[in-house]
């Protein structure tokens, strides 16, 4: 079951076998000397060219690979370690630990190419997944086993929200998380590791990195590596897992690079013709079964802010909720900078979340929308020109806006305020009181960066005492 390399075109390598034809997605291995060190390279079969020749995609840099070099067929697809042993470690696409903390002694290895759970095993019940973040739980609640898109530009706090969610899941649901860094910056991956170490959530999370500098094969398949680890926790251990993908756009982007390298005819905007199938194959595996669930949060980069671009458009079809981060909110110093009017959720339905929650959420959105409409008048004529009713709307809206902020556990290091987890009941109760005017006489500053309403009242008393 050995073959010889006959052609090397960057990350695409053709291999000839004499009496064996490897299957599509089968892993092949080759070892060679490069710069005085022995290197191991894993290739994944992408196409069968006939005459026992296969075209493969390299899972690492192919420098030093020469024609005539021997390649061994493994008879199986890429296998990665799964189970509790993977927690607290960093892996590359082929499941090797890259954090210099020794090999991973995993008892089980699974293939990264798996079928989605069959229909009869999928769970159909809709449950709200409580995150402890007020603005998310109130206005765009996540569903257990659902998919959330996290949209935002650079530096508005996508990664901080991701870390807070990992922290809250580890704390409240004592669950595990898997983080797949798909084609993002090495520096960010490094920062994330050390920040998690500092905020003590590292032992509850497995990290899989395929950074920007990797060849397209590694950047594409890393999403499957992370997902496989999450599936083990769901299927074999019956857990509710959180799966983070940062960034799902890079999954589509690397797929398009691979497709071009394999000589396939491109479709719209130069993307691969199989874009929606590839996206579907990944997303279909992220689901709830009768045993456990995978709730996924996917950061989505939108190229040139064009939501109709085929890559983000192919993600939209799969999402249950969107959390949109807005720079203008971050500039006001309100964190998390979630846009309360732009974020949506399939769960915001009175039949799922109940009448009370639904009415409070819609009430909050109405007041904020009215405030937004009045902002032009305020900017030109000032507050004094508004009617009494409008003044009240503005006052309440400003309090609501402030109350949508909250201190995070993972940001404690640089804000100095201890993080809070706010239960859904407390969240609904607080905003209901604000809408009913219970807190009209309180100081606006009392609502900024607090958890529940009791904290705001205590803060207000402190301000008044001064």
From Swiss-Prot:
F-type ATPases have 2 components, CF(1) - the catalytic core - and CF(0) - the membrane proton channel. CF(1) has five subunits: alpha(3), beta(3), gamma(1), delta(1), epsilon(1). CF(0) has three main subunits: a(1), b(2) and c(9-12). The alpha and beta chains form an alternating ring which encloses part of the gamma chain. CF(1) is attached to CF(0) by a central stalk formed by the gamma and epsilon chains, while a peripheral stalk is formed by the delta and b chains. NCBIfam families: atpD (TIGR01039). It is an enzyme of class 7 (translocase). Keywords: ATP synthesis, ATP-binding, Cell inner membrane, Cell membrane, CF(1), Hydrogen ion transport, Ion transport, Membrane, Nucleotide-binding, Translocase, Transport. It catalyses: ATP + H2O + 4 H(+)(in) = ADP + phosphate + 5 H(+)(out). Belongs to the ATPase alpha/beta chains family. GO terms for cellular component: plasma membrane; proton-transporting ATP synthase complex. This is ATP synthase subunit beta. It comes from Sulfurovum sp. (strain NBC37-1). It is a peripheral membrane protein. ATP binds at residues 152-159. Produces ATP from ADP in the presence of a proton gradient across the membrane. The catalytic sites are hosted primarily by the beta subunits. PANTHER family: ATP SYNTHASE, ATP SYNTHASE SUBUNIT BETA, MITOCHONDRIAL. Its EC number is 7.1.2.2. HAMAP family: ATP_synth_beta_bact. InterPro entries: AAA+_ATPase, ATP-synt_VA_C, ATP_synth_F1_bsu, ATPase_a/bsu_AS, ATPase_alpha/beta_chains, ATPase_F1/V1/A1_a/bsu_N, ATPase_F1/V1/A1_a/bsu_N_sf, ATPase_F1/V1/A1_a/bsu_nucl-bd. One of its GO terms (molecular function) is proton-transporting ATP synthase activity, rotational mechanism. PROSITE patterns: ATPASE_ALPHA_BETA (PS00152). It is found in: Cell inner membrane. SUPFAM superfamilies: C-terminal domain of alpha and beta subunits of F1 ATP synthase, N-terminal domain of alpha and beta subunits of F1 ATP synthase, P-loop containing nucleoside triphosphate hydrolases.
């Amino acid at each position: 079951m050995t073959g010889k390399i006959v052609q090397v075109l960057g990350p695409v390598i053709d291999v000839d076998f004499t009496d064996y034809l490897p299957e599509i997605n089968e892993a092949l291995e080759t070892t060679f000397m490069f710069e005085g060190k022995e290197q191991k390279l894993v290739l994944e079969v992408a196409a069968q060219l006939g005459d026992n020749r296969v075209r493969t995609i390299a899972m690492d840099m192919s420098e030093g690979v020469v024609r005539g070099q021997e390649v061994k067929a493994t008879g199986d697809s890429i296998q990665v370690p799964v189970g509790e042993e993977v927690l607290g470690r960093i892996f590359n696409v082929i499941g090797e630990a890259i954090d210099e903390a020794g090999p991973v002694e995993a008892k089980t290895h699974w293939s990264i190419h798996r079928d989605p759970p069959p229909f009869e095993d999928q769970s159909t019940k809709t449950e709200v997944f409580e995150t402890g973040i007020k603005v998310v739980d109130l206005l765009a609640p996540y569903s257990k086993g659902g998919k959330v898109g996290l949209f935002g530009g650079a530096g508005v706090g996508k990664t901080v929200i991701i870390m807070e969610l990992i922290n809250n899941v580890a704390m409240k649901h004592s669950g595990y998380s898997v983080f797949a860094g798909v084609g993002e910056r090495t520096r960010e991956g490094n920062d994330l590791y050390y920040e998690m170490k500092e905020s003590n959530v590292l032992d509850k999370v497995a990290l899989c990195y395929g950074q920007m500098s990797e060849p397209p094969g590694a950047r594409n398949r890393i999403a499957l590596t992370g997902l496989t680890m999450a599936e083990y926790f769901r299927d074999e251990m019956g857990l509710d897992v959180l799966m983070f993908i940062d960034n799902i756009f890079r999954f589509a982007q690397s797929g398009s690079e691979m497709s071009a390298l394999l000589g396939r005819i491109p479709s719209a905007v130069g993307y691969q013709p199989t874009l929606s199938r590839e996206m579907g194959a990944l997303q279909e595996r992220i689901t709830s079964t009768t045993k456990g669930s995978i709730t996924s949060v996917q950061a989505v980069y939108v190229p040139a802010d064009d939501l109709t671009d085929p890559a983000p458009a192919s993600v939209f079809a799969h999402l249950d909720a969107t959390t949109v981060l807005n720079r203008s909110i971050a500039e006001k110093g309100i964190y998390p900078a979630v846009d309360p009017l732009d974020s949506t959720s399939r769960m915001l339905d009175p039949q799922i979340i109940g009448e009370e929650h639904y009415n409070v959420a819609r009430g909050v959105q109405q007041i904020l929308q009215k405030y937004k409409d009045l902002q032009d008048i305020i900017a030109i004529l000032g507050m004094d020109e508004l009617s009494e009713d409008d003044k009240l709307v503005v006052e309440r809206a400003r309090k609501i806006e402030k109350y949508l902020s909250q201190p995070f556990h993972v940001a404690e290091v640089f804000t100095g305020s201890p993080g809070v987890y706010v239960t859904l009941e407390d969240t609904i109760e607080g905003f209901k009181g604000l809408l009913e005017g219970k807190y009209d006489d309180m100081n606006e500053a009392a609502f900024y960066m607090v958890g529940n309403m009791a904290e705001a009242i205590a803060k207000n008393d402190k301000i008044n005492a001064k």
